[in-house]
């Protein structure tokens, strides 16, 4: 996620940064007061940072092989506390970005699962409708056609006509035999 692209994300990041500053200040104060914290946690990174910074500056200016004096303990403790505070702010901000990324990925995964479920439901519905269509087509083919019905109707009328004629002639013969 690019922080510059979304104003809300940028505001959120700045808010987290502002909230983490008091935490960083407390860590800095604890680093300045505690001998153990100062000696083992603040001084080594500060001296390393000072050494890398001075070495880089010397190389840029063209000086080679110059020994770099370490910082005095007070300056190193101050620099170490500042580095620790900035690292805390960076870690909190980075953690927020990672959590936002995970949240976005979870939302994306859920959205894809919903789409997949909807797709499967649509495929099932299409399959069910295809079976219903086949059943209706089979019923339509099993039904006699209109021309067959017309033929049956004509045959029925012929039979009726024959029955009527036979019935009428038998009545006529019966009536004539009674006379």
From Swiss-Prot:
The keyword rRNA processing does not apply. Changing residue 122 to P: Homozygous mice have their visual function which is severely reduced, consistent with significant loss of retinal ganglion cells and degeneration of axons in the optic nerve. One of its GO terms (biological process) is fat cell differentiation. It is found in: Mitochondrion. One of its GO terms (cellular component) is mitochondrion. Signal peptide: none annotated. InterPro entries: OPA3-like (IPR010754). Residues 120-143 form a coiled coil. The keyword Heme does not apply. Keywords: Coiled coil, Mitochondrion. Belongs to the OPA3 family. May play some role in mitochondrial processes. This is Optic atrophy 3 protein homolog. It comes from Mus musculus. The lineage of its organism: Eukaryota, Metazoa, Chordata, Craniata, Vertebrata.
């Amino acid at each position: 996620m690019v922080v510059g692209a979304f104003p809300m994300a940028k505001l959120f990041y700045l808010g987290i940064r502002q909230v983490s500053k008091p935490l960083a200040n407390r860590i800095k104060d604890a680093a300045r007061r505690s001998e153990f914290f100062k000696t083992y946690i603040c001084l080594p990174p500060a001296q390393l940072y000072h050494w890398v910074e001075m070495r880089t500056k010397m190389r840029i200016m063209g000086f080679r092989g110059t020994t770099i004096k370490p910082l005095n303990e007070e300056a190193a403790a101050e620099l170490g506390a500042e580095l620790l505070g900035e690292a805390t702010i960076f870690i909190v901000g980075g953690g927020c970005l990672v959590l936002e990324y995970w949240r976005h990925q979870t939302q994306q995964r859920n959205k894809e699962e919903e789409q997949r479920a909807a797709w499967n439901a649509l495929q099932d519905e299409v399959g069910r409708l295809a079976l219903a269509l086949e059943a209706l087509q089979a019923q339509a083919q099993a039904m006699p056609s209109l021309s067959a019905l017309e033929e049956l109707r004509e045959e029925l009328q012929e039979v009726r006509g024959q029955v009527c004629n036979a019935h009428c002639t038998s009545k006529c013969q019966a009536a004539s035999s009674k006379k």
